[in-house]
């Protein structure tokens, strides 16, 4: 019997007690929905397999003492199939012990779950166990990473790549349609600074300092070997296309008929660098994401909001709702009407759009697209955007939407890369930062994704490179993957020994270690649902670590394959073999049941790792 089945049983009993007049003043309307009646795993196994606080939840509403209400609940539970014992403890806890067959039913539930319909999209051989449809019918637009196209993706963006894709997988496993989206900031001042930095690198490489070109990186520009690389690539591409950058540079130096400068010395050549370099960075970012196993459905270009008139249209929409006014020569969004701490400029007095104007248009576009319009727009932003939440939520409300429902903003905190207790600055291309490609080259995709997804994104996080590269139990990803590989090895040894679980009697899974593994397996569906509802994919990783620990402990105390057939230390010594066979080897029926349990663990670990975008290895 699963925890969910127990919750449904408890809910049914609550309604029956109301009907029978055994629940005091409690009415059907006062009974919480089933998902609010979750059972818990007691810390002390002497208190049973599961515990419920239903009596304490409802006692005040019933006008009864918790223990007095718990007694009829316990009596009804004790009559249910699959329950061996029920006790009322403490102030009103109800402790439930399942019979061995009922507890072991989860094994069949895991292995009988059908294959996923989109198997080609999954890393591992996953099935439907744990998956549900409680978010079905919703289209969620999940925007993440969205790093500026002015350099390689740094470690902060890498964290969002791992967390965002894991979150998308978790949401999809709960029935939602998820649109993974990358917002490509190819409009605005950061692009100008990028182009200026490239021109400076090009000018220095071509000795154009004497011609009036700045050869030093602007103080607000971008540095790193990648700038020199891209500048050289732009020059080579331009020359291949018959464009003479030096000639453009001289053209920039031209004067008008009055002998006055036509403009900044690098206007034309800077535009040439911009239009060529931004697509180069776009291609590089796309490749980094693909190599990191993150496949976006939409690559949205900020520039298109202006080119397609969407910024003007969104502002007109807000104006029609009475939320736009003019002051001091500028156009303002009256965001204070909707909870913001101050009103926001959207068109500056010089006629230029403020950055927030694009944000307004972008949200409106997400919600009203011809295809895949978002019921919920989820933004995953860095810690430096915390002050942006108020104006974004105000804008959501101004459009008639519900902040927190139609728009959700998740803030991620900083990541530090450490080795031997010291911060690491290992990028040769990007200067004083760590990039996604740097991290992957050192620890691999699996370790990078798992380590970044296993921690709460709302907390600062240190990555220990030495730990992630190690093959020890202290390395979380190794520990979980090894559990899967170990279970595969059990299968191979069982096959060699002629052991099969066909027709296995799962009621024989009656030891304490068996029970711990069974309970862990039973919790996966609720963990997956909670991870989706809370937007916290790290809960899947932490669950996998607990399951792996439980499995490793079980493996060490409960044999599946006879030791004499697999352990080198028993070979060639008949007496030793006999002694070990008597002491360690299970009878065939129990071995079959344990093999089936082994394979259920294997399946759940494969399912869970797949949700994190991490492989489940056959061998290690």
From Swiss-Prot:
It is an enzyme of class 6 (ligase). The keyword Protein biosynthesis applies. One of its GO terms (biological process) is arginyl-tRNA aminoacylation. It is found in: Cytoplasm. One of its GO terms (molecular function) is arginine-tRNA ligase activity. Its main location: cytoplasm. GO terms for cellular component: cytoplasm. Its EC number is 6.1.1.19. HAMAP family: Arg_tRNA_synth. Monomer. Belongs to the class-I aminoacyl-tRNA synthetase family. This is Arginine--tRNA ligase. It comes from Bifidobacterium longum (strain NCC 2705). The gene is argS.
């Amino acid at each position: 019997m699963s925890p969910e089945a127990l919750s449904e049983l408890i809910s049914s009993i609550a309604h029956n007690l109301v009907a029978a007049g055994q629940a005091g003043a409690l009415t059907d309307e006062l009974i919480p929905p089933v998902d609010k009646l979750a059972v818990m795993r007691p810390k002390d196994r002497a208190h049973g397999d599961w515990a419920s606080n239903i009596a304490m939840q409802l006692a005040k509403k019933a006008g009864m003492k918790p223990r007095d209400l718990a007694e009829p609940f316990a009596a009804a539970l004790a009559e249910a199939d699959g329950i061996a014992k029920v006790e009322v403890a403490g102030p009103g806890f109800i402790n439930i012990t399942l019979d061995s067959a009922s507890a072991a039913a989860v094994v069949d539930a895991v292995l009988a779950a059908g294959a996923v319909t989109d198997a080609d999209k999954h890393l591992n051989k996953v099935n439907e166990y744990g998956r549900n449809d409680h978010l079905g019918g919703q289209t969620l637009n999940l925007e993440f990473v969205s790093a500026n196209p002015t350099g390689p993706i740094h470690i902060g963006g890498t964290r969002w790549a791992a967390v965002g894709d894991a979150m998308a997988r978790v949401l999809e496993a709960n029935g939602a349609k998820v649109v993974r989206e990358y917002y490509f900031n190819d409009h605005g001042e950061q692009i100008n600074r990028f182009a200026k930095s490239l021109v400076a690198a090009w000018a220095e490489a071509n000795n154009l300092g004497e011609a009036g070109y700045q050869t030093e990186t602007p103080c607000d520009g971008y540095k790193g070997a990648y700038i020199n690389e891209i500048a050289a690539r732009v020059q080579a591409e331009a020359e291949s296309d018959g464009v003479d950058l030096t000639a453009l540079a001289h053209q920039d130096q031209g004067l008008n008929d009055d002998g006055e400068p036509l403009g900044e010395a690098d206007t034309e050549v800077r535009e040439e660098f911009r239009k060529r370099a931004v697509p180069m960075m776009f291609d590089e970012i796309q490749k980094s994401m693909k190599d990191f196993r993150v496949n976006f459905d939409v690559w949205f270009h900020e520039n298109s909001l202006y080119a397609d008139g969407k910024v003007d249209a969104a502002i007109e929409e807000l104006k029609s709702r009475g939320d736009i006014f003019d002051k001091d020569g500028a156009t303002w969004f009256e965001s204070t009407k909707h909870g913001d701490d101050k009103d926001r400029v959207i068109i500056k007095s010089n006629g230029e759009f403020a950055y927030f104007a694009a944000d307004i248009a972008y949200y409106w576009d997400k919600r009203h697209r011809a295809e895949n319009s978002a019921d919920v727009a989820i933004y995953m932003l860095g810690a430096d955007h915390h002050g942006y939440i108020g104006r974004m939520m105000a804008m959501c409300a101004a459009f008639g939407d519900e902040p927190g429902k139609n728009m959700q903003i998740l803030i991620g905190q900083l990541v530090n890369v450490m080795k031997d207790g010291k911060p690491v600055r290992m990028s040769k291309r990007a200067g004083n930062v760590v990039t996604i490609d740097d991290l992957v080259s050192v620890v691999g995709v699996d370790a990078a994704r798992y380590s970044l997804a296993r921690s709460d994104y709302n907390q600062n996080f240190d990555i220990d490179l030495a730990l992630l590269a190690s093959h020890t139990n202290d390395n979380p990803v190794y520990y979980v993957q090894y559990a899967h590989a170990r279970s595969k090895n059990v299968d191979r040894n069982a096959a060699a020994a002629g052991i099969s679980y066909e027709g296995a009697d799962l009621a024989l899974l009656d030891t304490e270690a068996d029970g711990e593994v069974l309970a862990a397996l039973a919790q996966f569906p609720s963990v997956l649902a909670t991870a989706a509802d809370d937007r916290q994919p790290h809960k899947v990783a932490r669950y996998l670590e607990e399951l792996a620990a439980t499995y490793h402990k079980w493996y060490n105390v409960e044999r599946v394959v006879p030791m004499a057939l697999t352990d080198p230390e028993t070979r060639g010594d008949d007496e030793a073999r006999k002694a070990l066979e008597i002491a360690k080897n299970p009878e065939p029926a129990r071995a079959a049941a344990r093999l089936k349990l082994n394979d259920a663990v294997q399946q759940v670990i494969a399912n869970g790792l797949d949700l994190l975008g991490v492989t489940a290895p056959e061998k290690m």
